[in-house]
């Protein structure tokens, strides 16, 4: 059951614009930067960030797609034959010696990010890995923090954050729901 909308379309747009500026500022431009979205919604957020960065800097940033299914420590079985549902990774550029900016919708326990870092390291040795998230809800189980955060939304363990994006859900909003 939905309790509250914490970000509407305008708030998401503003947060992504701010994150784009922060990425440019922290990296002193975008030379050597690549964006890698964590499937599913992280991909769309990475694409939106790339658009904003291009508008600001006038240069495009490569965007890749990362499927971390086989890297998770809590491998969930999502098909009838109990095999993991693998969606495929598409990172059409080298990550070695690049500043890889992982992009995801929600930072919670840190386990997804840990799995994403393992997946990136299997592709090469980046100069640096940074993390951009739309929402940080706390409750970390691993020592991971985001470099770029759209909004901090403290939650209880009985709540979940639901991110809806137009590309997937037909609407842009972030809301808190009861489990």
Curated annotation (Swiss-Prot):
Query: Kind of enzyme, top EC level?
Result: transferase
Which InterPro entries has this protein been placed in? PRibTrfase_dom, PRTase-like, PyrR, PyrR_bifunctional
Q: Which GO terms describe its molecular function?
A: RNA binding; uracil phosphoribosyltransferase activity
Going by the UniProt record, its keywords in alphabetical order are: Glycosyltransferase, RNA-binding, Transcription, Transcription regulation, Transcription termination, Transferase
Q: Which reaction does it catalyse?
A: UMP + diphosphate = 5-phospho-alpha-D-ribose 1-diphosphate + uracil
Cross-referenced Pfam families, in alphabetical order? Pribosyltran
Q: What is its EC number?
A: 2.4.2.9
Q: Where is this motif: PRPP-binding?
A: 100-112
Subunit relationships: Homodimer and homohexamer; in equilibrium.
Q: What is this protein called?
A: Bifunctional protein PyrR
Q: What does this protein do?
A: Regulates transcriptional attenuation of the pyrimidine nucleotide (pyr) operon by binding in a uridine-dependent manner to specific sites on pyr mRNA. This disrupts an antiterminator hairpin in the RNA and favors formation of a downstream transcription terminator, leading to a reduced expression of downstream genes.
Q: What GO biological process term is on the record, naming one?
A: DNA-templated transcription termination
Q: Which family does it belong to?
A: Belongs to the purine/pyrimidine phosphoribosyltransferase family. PyrR subfamily.
